[in-house]
From Swiss-Prot:
Subunit annotation: Part of the 50S ribosomal subunit.
GO molecular function annotation: rRNA binding; structural constituent of ribosome
One GO CC term, this protein: cytosolic large ribosomal subunit
Full protein name: Large ribosomal subunit protein uL22
Record has rRNA-binding as a keyword: yes
Presence of the UniProt keyword Cell inner membrane in the record: no
InterPro entries, A to Z: Ribosomal_uL22, Ribosomal_uL22_bac/chlpt-type, Ribosomal_uL22_bac/org-type, Ribosomal_uL22_CS, Ribosomal_uL22_sf
Length: 114
């Protein structure tokens, strides 16, 4: 049986746009977990805080469930898929209305040993 060398964490239906999440995830993909946490800490963005929590969860899964060393971990995969969209309407002039899409994300982070 093969030894497990990666761990995954997900945050589903997070109230942040997938497009904005992907901008942050592109910065940490392939980096050492310590560097990735430092990058997220100093990124002034709502998505960065959420992604930091998911990354810490993936690290905890790797340490507690699979006995991997934190020092050897890198962010092997990081992606944001589109979740359900909440549709709202904003009243406009002359009795019309414009749609507002409140988008959500499913954020996934996978850490693996280098």
């Amino acid at each position: 049986m093969a030894e497990i060398t990666s761990a995954k964490a997900m945050a589903r239906t997070v109230r942040v746009s997938p497009r904005k999440s992907r901008l942050i995830l592109d910065n940490i993909r392939g980096k050492n977990v310590a560097d990735a946490i430092a990058i997220l800490k100093f990124t002034p963005n709502k998505a960065a805080g959420i992604i930091e929590k998911v990354l810490n969860s993936a690290i905890a899964n790797a340490e507690n469930n699979f006995g991997l060393e934190k020092a050897n971990l890198v962010v092997s995969e990081a992606f944001a898929n589109e979740g359900p969209t909440m549709k709202r309407f904003r009243p406009r002039a002359k009795g019309s209305a414009s749609p507002i899409n409140k988008r959500t994300s499913h954020i996934t982070v996978v850490v693996a040993e280098k």
